Amino acid sequence: MIIETNHACDLVIFGAKGDLTKRKLLPALYKLEKSKKIHKYTRIIASGRADWSTEDYIEKIKTEVKNFLNEEINDLIWKNLSSRIFFCNIDVHEPLHFFRLKTILKQKKNIIVYYCAVPSNTLNSIFIGLGNAHLNSVPSRIVLEKPLGVCLKTSKKINDQISKYFLESQIFRIDHYLGKESILNLFALRFSNTCLFYNWNNKTIDHIQITVSEEVGIEDRWNYFNMMGQMKDMVQNHLLQILTILTMDQPKNISSESIQHEKVKILRSLNPINIHNINKKTVRGQYCSGVINEKKVPSYLEENGANKNSLTETFVAIKVDLNNKQWSGVPFYLRTGKRLAHKYSEIVVFFKKKPTNLFKNLNSELLQNKLIIRLEPNPNIIFDFSVKAPGLEQEYKIENSQLKSSQFSKKYSKNSIDAYERLLFEIMRGVQSLFVCRDEIEAAWKWIDPIIHAWKNSKNNAPQLYMSGTWGPKNSDLLLAHDGRVWYEFH
């Protein structure tokens, strides 16, 4: 059954020539057009400073869509999509230009969605321009990309600015990880399976590891990445989302308010990391040159436009503790980095060992049960457990076995939906459950800021170097070794 968006929308893209629009938004819109999920009267208004006609813009973006779509463009689908597109020449720093946009929008009675695919320092000009032109009334919606700001102070400033013109119910703050099928499955996995629901706590779980590993470097984004670093770009932005979904209490229902409420509670329960425990709780690194996929790659300081004295981290490993009844005493080890050995994202839940060993005659130590949740590539769920080794021996020889959800993996590869495809669909429907609220963002920054401050003010504040194509700095292993643990090996 085909479900299209409930109402016709005018999707206005600020930053229509930018990287996000070319790489993510337009390919996602093409796929939504292909699956007939866009209302037949929905329009796409691309805005930018270029003095282009609509025909100019459509001609230029077709090549870009081809590059990032990962499939051949179907002429009929492209014709249908491009017929929705209008180009509007706007300089967002010129408030009067927004009246040009108003002229186009007045032609229809569609619900207006403003997608801000622009840097954070441009946002307030957009808010002011829309407000002055009276283009901010309900039921219009506005979409902001995370991370919002670079710290708690700047994030609050942006939220204060937008709240002058838009209600919280109109604001959609995107973290694209929340549109990934494998991330959404964590809700179902946790809250629909009795065997996990009643064992998802500090009574049965020893510790949890979360890894988001990237093979790529900064991909010609020096100015942006050097300002953010891996902590702000990935931990604050994505890994904390995974952590909150893994640890939140069951919400009252699946409404955005209930889910966001439980996630905020987790973020506010994170034990602080500061100058007093920074070296025990965190490791940060920066990649050197090396070899990935048999290709030589440069160091971070050799990237295009690099500042040779930069101390920005490209790798973070961090031990996180929660101060609540359910998770007290269970450490969470997070790591993420660029130019690592393999690209993958994975959660590994280590269950506690049995206090007694019935089979100790032949097995000095029983193997630890593990639940491995592979997020990407090839999403899968694997359970590590112990069984009797086959044979005629009277004594029990215990060996490790794995239960793999092969059917789950096949379904995901066949029916996988791109994160932006899902999120754009939800935005046009007006559903906020996959988006982040103000309290959530500010609670995350409140925890992250002291870590950044401690790094800058510690005696040895330089990131540890690691060779591209490895698993990061050696101290990442020591972070777990101090607790008698090791990182789960990539398979």
Swiss-Prot record:
<comment type="similarity">
    <text>Belongs to the glucose-6-phosphate dehydrogenase family.</text>
</comment>
<dbReference type="GO" id="GO:0006006">
    <property type="term" value="P:glucose metabolic process"/>
</dbReference>
<keyword id="KW-0560">Oxidoreductase</keyword>
<dbReference type="InterPro" id="IPR019796">
    <property type="entry name" value="G6P_DH_AS"/>
</dbReference>
<feature type="active site" description="Proton acceptor">
    <location>
        <position position="238"/>
    </location>
</feature>
<feature type="binding site">
    <location>
        <position position="338"/>
    </location>
    <ligand>
        <name>substrate</name>
    </ligand>
</feature>
<dbReference type="InterPro" id="IPR022674">
    <property type="entry name" value="G6P_DH_NAD-bd"/>
</dbReference>
<comment type="pathway">
    <text>Carbohydrate degradation; pentose phosphate pathway; D-ribulose 5-phosphate from D-glucose 6-phosphate (oxidative stage): step 1/3.</text>
</comment>
<feature type="binding site">
    <location>
        <begin position="91"/>
        <end position="92"/>
    </location>
    <ligand>
        <name>NADP(+)</name>
    </ligand>
</feature>
<feature type="binding site">
    <location>
        <position position="233"/>
    </location>
    <ligand>
        <name>substrate</name>
    </ligand>
</feature>
<feature type="binding site">
    <location>
        <position position="49"/>
    </location>
    <ligand>
        <name>NADP(+)</name>
    </ligand>
</feature>
<feature type="binding site">
    <location>
        <position position="214"/>
    </location>
    <ligand>
        <name>substrate</name>
    </ligand>
</feature>
<dbReference type="InterPro" id="IPR001282">
    <property type="entry name" value="G6P_DH"/>
</dbReference>
<dbReference type="InterPro" id="IPR022675">
    <property type="entry name" value="G6P_DH_C"/>
</dbReference>
<comment type="function">
    <text>Catalyzes the oxidation of glucose 6-phosphate to 6-phosphogluconolactone.</text>
</comment>
<keyword id="KW-0521">NADP</keyword>
<protein>
    <recommendedName>
        <fullName>Glucose-6-phosphate 1-dehydrogenase</fullName>
        <ecNumber>1.1.1.49</ecNumber>
    </recommendedName>
</protein>
<feature type="binding site">
    <location>
        <position position="176"/>
    </location>
    <ligand>
        <name>substrate</name>
    </ligand>
</feature>
<dbReference type="GO" id="GO:0004345">
    <property type="term" value="F:glucose-6-phosphate dehydrogenase activity"/>
</dbReference>
<feature type="binding site">
    <location>
        <position position="180"/>
    </location>
    <ligand>
        <name>substrate</name>
    </ligand>
</feature>
<dbReference type="GO" id="GO:0009051">
    <property type="term" value="P:pentose-phosphate shunt, oxidative branch"/>
</dbReference>
<dbReference type="InterPro" id="IPR036291">
    <property type="entry name" value="NAD(P)-bd_dom_sf"/>
</dbReference>
<dbReference type="GO" id="GO:0005829">
    <property type="term" value="C:cytosol"/>
</dbReference>
<dbReference type="Pfam" id="PF02781">
    <property type="entry name" value="G6PD_C"/>
</dbReference>
<keyword id="KW-0119">Carbohydrate metabolism</keyword>
<dbReference type="Pfam" id="PF00479">
    <property type="entry name" value="G6PD_N"/>
</dbReference>
<feature type="binding site">
    <location>
        <position position="343"/>
    </location>
    <ligand>
        <name>substrate</name>
    </ligand>
</feature>
<keyword id="KW-0313">Glucose metabolism</keyword>
<dbReference type="GO" id="GO:0050661">
    <property type="term" value="F:NADP binding"/>
</dbReference>
<feature type="binding site">
    <location>
        <position position="146"/>
    </location>
    <ligand>
        <name>NADP(+)</name>
    </ligand>
</feature>
